[in-house]
């Protein structure tokens, strides 16, 4: 029997937890599922996507990139643009057929929203 994996919940370092929570809510349409200020940790969710945010005060310059898949790239792009998200790349068709656009969060982490070619 093969065990099926079903979801992923990336853990992303942020420079200011409160500011990042606000950004994910206001600019990307996520809701707070869990907030633990004393542990500098939160989980934000939208649909079936959960992103774990943790405050990293180490001053290291590592940033994270994640892919989130959608069935309607144009509608999502318009929504996030209207919310004032930091779009770092508009909608592009990649050589392999997927269409995507990129957003940077308030800590510089990159989120790539992708519509697979077969959608």
Residue ranges of model-derived segments:
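Vicinal oxygen chelate
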Residues: 16-17, 66-110
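Conserved short beta-strand elements that form part of the metal-binding/catalytic scaffold
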Residues: 31-64, 110-115
